[in-house]
Structure formats: structure tokens, C-alpha cells
């Protein structure tokens, strides 16, 4: 396929148009007075959103060179979203500002390699200053403030803070669509998995159709149980101890199931059998998780173990187990805390190593069930369009909250970026490296100016007023006042700001050192052949 090649300023100008087109579409969403963007969908209703990365992902430009510029800034938003889960609009604005300032200097004859070095020096220093200024989250109220600012809704902020308080830092919080107008929070204690009793005759409460076992013994096996002979030695011991039993196996069928049900109905045995959750290797891993949580052992054929030789010591324990037709919940397992902690650390290491989003999600679920619990935020809305927008806001707020817990908080509303400029050390650099440092300093002013402009105010005037204000003061865009940002609860996660600075400077500095841009030449569509002429005399 033939290629089109652009060089020097011509190449960079085309890239800049793409950068500006995408950034201008995204930056209108910044701050509490930010606007929404409507995205056409190939099916269903349009999506109305103010989520930077969602908007960026939708943008494709017709001109291939401009599209490459847009794609580079799109990468900034996506990377920031992957690292911190929020701050994508800030990252996009910073990238646009660096490209704009940098291209001005290149047009004046600056060396792009030295400019890049200056940008990298300034970015590193900015991140070091940011880390020094970050304040550890100390209260549930601060978690609520971070979530409220990210979602643009105080009620959502409170809901997320409640969820974090219930499941802890390592617990999983999921977002689902509700069937009502209200947004609510549900929490699940203990380990829950999506498998219920294999027979309804095993219930202990026939009205609610649930089986509840107090202080049960828990038999775990990856084996399919079809013969009662395998279970008999172990069950005889549990009957002597008058203990209820939960059996978690690959499957329970045939004679074994019939005998268990008959003995349950006669009152000889208090037993509930459920199938093990998941499939294949994931099933084995979850069975091991349950074993560690309950202090038991998986009776595994792979390890050469036989069910008929299993002992009471190999069974797990729990305070209570509740089983419905499609759910099993184990509360207060009897496992050793050191074993559980070791398993948690092992799963965390696997999360760090995996590149698959699906595997990561499943590992996070296992981690939550072992260490904290699960909270579900059920999102209610009047229409599907509102539902999608609300869901995106809550997901962003959740990510921002986790980021704040991880690396602390800083003054919000772009105030920290001005603080960083003033606190940066003197680099003692001259020439084009100093110009690169100056590019970053000017770019860090862009977010606060944009927040003001989205309020209908002059960004330059607001910037100067903040500069003249006491330390820690910034622009409260919601109320259009100059206040102490942290005292008023206008805070941002340090991790989100760090990701925005890192990703914007990285991509923008690479764009500035671009000298040639190569794109595929579109093949012209051949015109369809016209209809053949008619023979003389034919109608």
C-alpha cells in the first residue's frame, strides 16, 4: 500500500490539530461546572457523559495525520485511567498545553531533544514535590469528600465512603444497575460463592428455603461423589460429635445424594451439599481459598488422597454457613490469620503480574472474599441514558477513592499544580533545557484556567487571584469563592495527579521530537461501470 509522508513543521502542525480537536472535546467536562458531551452509539440511545476517557475513546478523525495526533492524546487518557482510574481530563489538558508551548519553541528554532530533557527533568521534580505534599487519608469524611468531588454528587460520595468502611481497603466494591430509581448499597459478609444446595430437601427453613448451619464442619474435595461408601467413615465421626456438615464437592449424585437426603429427612444427619464454584484451575484455586479461610484441607485426587481415608482434622470450621438455592455464604472461618495473610499476599502478587483484565477481575474477587468482603452499589435512574452516565461517575469516584487511600490526598481544583510550580527547585539549567522546564511550569497552570473558563470566568484572572491568595487557598468553582481547599474538603488523590503529570509529559515530549509522520494512502474507489449501450432499434 502506498504511503503519504509529512516532514518537520508540516507533520507537527497536523498532529497538533488532532491533539487540539480531541483535547477541546474533553476539556469542557473539567470541574464542578464542566459540561456534558453527547456520544452517538451505533445502537441504542446516545450516551451523555462527562468522563474524559470515555469521550477520548470515541474520537476518530478523518485525516490520518490529525488522527495520529488525537490517538497520542487518547493514549494519555487511557494510561491515566489504567493507573489511577480518574484524572483523564486533567492529563489530556496538560498534554495539550505541553504540545502547544513546545511547538511554539520549536517554530522559534529550539532543539527538540534538549526541550524533551527539560520536560523530563521538570516532570520528575514535580512528582517528587507532589509526593512530599501528599497527606495520608485519616478519616471516612475525607474518603467521602474525594468520592463526592469525582462523582460530582455528595450522596454518591457518602455511599462510597460507607462501602469502603464496611469492606476495607482490600474489599471489592462492585457497581450494578438497580431495577428501581434509588441508588443503594448492599454488603456481603464472609466468603460468598454462586452455588447453592444440590437438593431442596436439605433446607433447614422451609418458608425461606434456606439452610443455616451453626459451627459446622466443612468437607472440601475436588472429587465427584457418587458412592456413600466413600463418605461413611467421616460422617459417622461427625454424627458422634453432633456437628452439622457442609460438603463442597465437584458434584454429589446417585446413591450418595439419595442417602444424604434420606438421612437428613430422618434427622440422622444435619448435612448440606453444594457444588464447588467455577471451573478448571479457577475451581481448584477457590477450593484452596476456602480451605485456608476455614482451616481445612482440600481432599484432592491429584494429591493421591482418598475420601474414605479423610479425618476430622482435615475438615474446615466456620461460625455459620448459610445456603440458598444459588448462593453459599461462609462467615467467620476457622483458618489461621497468618495463613490467610500469606494467601492474600500471593493473590496480590498474581494481580500485579497478570496482563489479562478478566483474570485481574477474578483475582480481585478472590482477594476480597478472603480479606474484606464484598459491597455492591446498585445504581438507580429514571432512564437508561442517565443510568449509564451515573454508573460511569460512580466507577470514576471509586477509582479516585482507592487512589486516595493508596497515595494520599492533595488540594484539589488545580491548586496543587500551582503549589508544585512554586515549590520546584532551581535547576541551574540554561538554554533549551531551561525552556523545556518552563514548558511544564506553564502547562501546570492550564487545569485551573480551564476550570475557571468552564464557569464562564476569565482563566487568567482566576489564576492570578489564586497566586495572590494565602498558601493552600484555591478557587472553589462550585461556589465561585477563594477558599482553603483542604479545609473545605476540595481534595484530589495524589495518585491521580501523579499519573496525569507522568503520562502527559511522556507522550507530549515524544510528540515534540517527531520529525516525520507516515500514513497509509487511501485507495480511490473505482467508479462503477455504467450500463452497456442498447442495440439500435431496441426500446
Swiss-Prot record:
EC assignment: 5.6.1.7
SUPFAM superfamilies (UniProt xref): GroEL apical domain-like, GroEL equatorial domain-like, GroEL-intermediate domain like
GO cellular component entries: cytoplasm
Binding site for ATP: 29-32, 86-90, 413, 492
Catalysed transformations (reactions): ATP + H2O + a folded polypeptide = ADP + phosphate + an unfolded polypeptide
Record's keyword terms, sorted: ATP-binding, Chaperone, Cytoplasm, Isomerase, Nucleotide-binding
A molecular function (GO) term: ATP-dependent protein folding chaperone
Cell compartment(s), UniProt: Cytoplasm
Biological process (GO), any one: protein refolding
One Pfam family per UniProt: Cpn60_TCP1
Primary residence: cytoplasm
Source species, domain of life: Bacteria
Protein family: Belongs to the chaperonin (HSP60) family.
Biological role stated in the UniProt entry: Together with its co-chaperonin GroES, plays an essential role in assisting protein folding. The GroEL-GroES system forms a nano-cage that allows encapsulation of the non-native substrate proteins and provides a physical environment optimized to promote and accelerate protein folding.
Assembly mode: Forms a cylinder of 14 subunits composed of two heptameric rings stacked back-to-back. Interacts with the co-chaperonin GroES.
Protein name, per record: Chaperonin GroEL
Gene designation: groEL
